[in-house]
């Protein structure tokens, strides 16, 4: 599958989707994107910058949602213009898709909306690549139905069916907790879609702080290493210059100054894993 100006897949190095959870300001967004670009260029990691113009799914109605669509998209367009980066952001309703698709390179669907058929169809008809997040309530094999919906809509619109990624972000485990079953990455590969692992939302504690979500960022490196060891096409991680002051999802964000070391470790592991065939292909 081609994403921007690079190819993705199990026979390629993993690509990275990374950035702040939400657009907080223009300067911080440009600075963060610039630092990530520098890191990824040094490590030769294909990179897509991500940030949200609006966080529609909030624990509390008083939580910070973002700067709004117009200002958020303007800032994301500046990331593209000033830094020459590909940009991803999430859409939350059908009416947002057209204006957002006119600015960004990749759309993302929120996990809670993965079974909304009309919404998935509309995203597929945008013509953009789409990172489809698996719901926290969904079994990994059920992602086949979601990917099939997107492919069917694309085919009916006369568009390429080879534009959809399946993203794992953990599964609900009791109240206010998520776990990551690494088998799900292999199971979702059977859809034929490139599989992405969201290493930061997977350590989220949804609603764990009452009016906001908590998180356990100390487990991000653990889960990221495990996911890369299974063989994945892409990795998703949110980061922030100062997670303690982040306006959204700070507890599970990777400190920006730790990204280089973490990514270097993951690249070494990815190269080792992909040097040899995947043994599970011969185990049935």
UniProtKB/Swiss-Prot annotation:
GO terms classed as biological process: keto-3-deoxy-D-manno-octulosonic acid biosynthetic process
InterPro entries registered for this protein in UniProt: Aldolase_TIM, DAHP1/KDSA, KDO8P_synthase
Compartmental location: Cytoplasm
Domain of life assignment: Bacteria
Enzymatic class: transferase
Pathway assigned in UniProt: Carbohydrate biosynthesis; 3-deoxy-D-manno-octulosonate biosynthesis; 3-deoxy-D-manno-octulosonate from D-ribulose 5-phosphate: step 2/3; Bacterial outer membrane biogenesis; lipopolysaccharide biosynthesis
Cellular component aspect of the GO annotation: cytoplasm
Protein name: 2-dehydro-3-deoxyphosphooctonate aldolase
Protein species of origin: Paraburkholderia phymatum (strain DSM 17167 / CIP 108236 / LMG 21445 / STM815)
């Amino acid at each position: 599958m081609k994403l921007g100006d690079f190819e993705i897949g199990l026979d390629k190095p993993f690509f990275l989707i990374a950035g702040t959870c939400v657009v907080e300001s223009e300067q911080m967004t440009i600075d963060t994107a610039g630092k990530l670009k520098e890191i990824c260029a040094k490590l030769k990691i294909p990179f897509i910058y991500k940030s949200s113009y609006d966080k529609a799914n909030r624990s509390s109605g008083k939580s910070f949602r973002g700067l709004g669509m117009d200002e958020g998209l303007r800032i994301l367009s500046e990331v593209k213009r000033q830094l020459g980066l590909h940009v991803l952001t999430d859409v939350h309703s059908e009416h947002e898709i057209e204006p957002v698709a006119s600015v960004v390179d990749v759309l993302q669907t929120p996990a809670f909306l993965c079974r909304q058929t009309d919404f998935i169809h509309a995203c597929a008809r945008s013509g953009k690549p789409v990172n489809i997040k698996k719901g926290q309530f969904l079994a990994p094999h059920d992602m086949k139905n979601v990917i099939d919906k997107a492919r069917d809509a694309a085919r009916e619109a006369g568009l390429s069916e080879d534009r959809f990624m399946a993203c794992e972000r953990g599964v609900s485990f009791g109240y206010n907790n998520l776990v990551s079953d690494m088998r799900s990455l292999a199971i979702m590969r059977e859809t034929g879609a490139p599989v992405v692992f969201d290493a930061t939302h997977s350590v989220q504690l949804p609603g764990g702080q009452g009016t906001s979500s908590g998180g356990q960022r100390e487990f991000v490196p653990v889960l990221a290493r495990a996911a890369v060891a299974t063989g994945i096409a892409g990795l998703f991680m949110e980061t922030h210059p100062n997670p303690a002051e982040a306006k959204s999802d700070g507890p599970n964000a990777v400190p920006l100054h730790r990204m280089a070391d973490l990514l270097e470790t993951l690249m070494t592991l990815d190269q080792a894993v992909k040097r040899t065939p995947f043994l599970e292909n011969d185990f049935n």
